Amino acid sequence: MMMHNRRAMTLYNLFPLLAGPFSRWGEHFTRAAAMGFDWVFVNPIQRPGASRSLYSIADYFGFNPALLDPQSTTPPAEQVRQMVSQARASGLRLMIDLVINHCAIDSPLTREHPEWFVREPDGRVSSPFCLENGQKVVWHDLAQFDHHHTRDPEGLYRYCLSVVEHLLALGFQGFRCDAAYQVPPNLWQRLIQEIKSRHLHTCFVAETLGCSADQTRDTAQSGFDYVFNSSKWWNFQDWWLIEQYNLVRETTRSISFPESHDTPRLCQEVNGNLNAVKQWYLFSALFSAGVMMPIGFEFGFRKPLHVVNTSPADWEKTDADLTSYIAKVNAIKKGHFVFHEESPTNMFPYQNPNILIMWKASAKHRDEALLILNKDPQHHQEFSTDQFRRFVQSGAPLRDVSPEYALEYIHEPFHYSLRPGQGLVLVTSRM
């Protein structure tokens, strides 16, 4: 097992356009480390095409002018290395987007290597698309690489490999692989194996937004260390999340997130209810082996991140500060093996439908845990049980390690009025 897989994956998404030039990122690294994050994921920093979208990369070896210090005479690559050094000084590892499903439609690559791209019947370079509510949505600023049928598969593969080696040389140690399921599994398998043969502890994470559970599993089998799961869209009730979790967990680990750069801000979705924001972070952190949150989540930001239009001027002044709470949740995650892995997990039915009872047991250690969560972020909800043995296998006493209002002793029979959105985190060890 790789070194990075021995502990929980805690990932802070520093969105480059909101953070501004690399020289200003230090304060965000300091805050991320203080909250207990080990990794910082940054979206693409390469030079974009005419659309200016972060994900429309025109030059994989150049840098986005919006992220460079205009007053500095330091070469761009050195500015990146200095930023990486700041992250490492804070005890953080850096992950970056790897975008090899497509590039910018105006990238020189479309002229220099026309054989690398999917073509329309009339010969034009194809743009990737998706279907939303039955409607075809085309990203006209993108050109789709033809990994499946190119006449020069080795040349295209070697180019992708050189991009990864370039980013590793800058100091990045992990890759969030954008639209991973749209790239052939055999390419991922070869790329990951070749990189890890030279850089053993490199971490690869598959972004699989919008694909089926089977596609997620098939992508995971290509050698990825983690995939992103769909817990963000769960309603705390339906069984599909556990089915998806169980389908993938034997293959690799997964990462939950309460919001991302692709979704609305959670604080906006819940109309500023911080009980709901805390509720979702606690669940996301403890449900799967990994957790990710984007910059600004800790302050209850409401304005969505945008891959073209976001700027440092969009930094919000709020009255919310969840940094201490997030640090406590991350400490719980790191402190118990059961939250480091894709543990066997079950949801127990309960007489009060507003209470979620999630059981987890480590497959590799003796840890066992219960999360008793008030689904209702507006009202108190009552939980009671004569004994906890109906929920856990261990006969050892339960300990309350909750991030807030932890109980010194767990009595039986047990009765507790959960505050709005509150979660009890109880742990024990099987004998």
Language-model features: locations:
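Aromatic/acidic polysaccharide-binding cleft in carbohydrate-active enzymes
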Residues: 252-320
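Glycoside hydrolase catalytic-domain groove-lining segments
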Residues: 230-259
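C-terminal beta-strand-rich structural cap/linker in extracellular carbohydrate-active enzymes
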Residues: 409-431
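Solvent-exposed beta-hairpin/edge-strand motifs
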Residues: 387-405
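A structural motif
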Residues: 37, 169-172, 224, 289-290
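Acidic/aromatic-lined carbohydrate-recognition and catalytic surfaces
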Residues: 2-151, 155-162, 166-169, 176, ...
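Aromatic- and carboxylate-lined catalytic core of secreted/periplasmic carbohydrate-active enzymes
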Residues: 301-347
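Carbohydrate-binding surface patches
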Residues: 348-391
